[in-house]
């Protein structure tokens, strides 16, 4: 059995990873060692059926004794520890949820239902750094993988509807707190059937604009609104989140020529499911039934939702998908621009295939 160290296992992504590993009995195949950046010496969790104490996540000697390190601790930790470990001669496998190493030449972005061939080639060629991808990119490829695998995609334009969880646990709490403030502000009026809805709306809007809602994490109110910008601003007018779409898609697929991917990334008031609306330029006219067959056959989690109003409203929403590994795709139809133009709408859990699941499956391959 390999010695596997876990850092950042208590955070949101780490907690989902632990839950999935317990469900799949992954701990049966490894010797887990749990680390902490702040609580060393305290009792370690018993996920693996073993007892012990939390180790120091900054102790290079302890880390060097590991065969595999899995970190969900974030980019600052990776930037501090990873170079020191490699410079010390450590030759173990590093599996990371943070974005810091994604675009490095000696790292592979992991999404095995989509790029197992790239992962296998990397392992055969001595690659030892494996990084989870951007959540929207991973979820897009899980849902639309059949089109990419059959070399049918000329370019992709996307508008995202990204959940609060993409920012982190504090962002989710802030969204719910904002919702509570707004409701509490008009609760009496809502309980009075004769109250005027426009008066209620004015009270809500006034509070939203008042500066009284908690916005420490988002910077502006999200409840009852949206934020059409995610991550840093780049010189070309993109947000960094939008830049990742093309950069990471092409690295994951190891394309020989770049597939253009661009669009707008928007934060909305969903909790943990990202949704995306796509305009896809196909390389040739492909019938909708064939498109549906290719998408459904690509991986066990891609589910084609018929382009029917009632079915779509039931099955193609964050409420329906949250907490599941299913990555449904629907609203598939040809657009007025021509027979090569396809619309699609996808939904996926940002914490599962968007974050924890690719890490878990990579660890399973290595262990």
Swiss-Prot record:
Keyword 4Fe-4S: no
Free-text comment on this protein's domains from its UniProt entry: Consists of two domains, an N-terminal nucleotide-binding domain and a C-terminal dimerization domain.
Residues that, per the record, bind NADP(+): 10-13, 37-38, 73, 165-169, 173, 193, 350
Positions annotated as active site in the UniProt record: 135, 274
UniProt name for this protein: Aspartate-semialdehyde dehydrogenase
Self-association state and partner proteins as the record states: Homodimer.
Gene3D superfamilies: Dihydrodipicolinate Reductase, domain 2, NAD(P)-binding Rossmann-like Domain
Free-text function comment from the UniProt entry: Catalyzes the NADPH-dependent formation of L-aspartate-semialdehyde (L-ASA) by the reductive dephosphorylation of L-aspartyl-4-phosphate.
PROSITE patterns: ASD
Catalytic activity annotation: L-aspartate 4-semialdehyde + phosphate + NADP(+) = 4-phospho-L-aspartate + NADPH + H(+)
InterPro entries, per the entry: Asp-semialdehyde_DH_CS (IPR000319), Asp_ADH_gamma-type (IPR011534), Asp_semialdehyde_DH (IPR012080), NAD(P)-bd_dom_sf (IPR036291), Semialdehyde_DH_NAD-bd (IPR000534), Semialdhyde_DH_dimer_dom (IPR012280)
Lineage summary: Bacteria, Pseudomonadati, Pseudomonadota, Gammaproteobacteria, Enterobacterales
Enzyme class, broadest EC rank: oxidoreductase
Keywords carried by this UniProt record: Amino-acid biosynthesis, Diaminopimelate biosynthesis, Lysine biosynthesis, Methionine biosynthesis, NADP, Oxidoreductase, Threonine biosynthesis
Binding of phosphate, residues: 102, 244
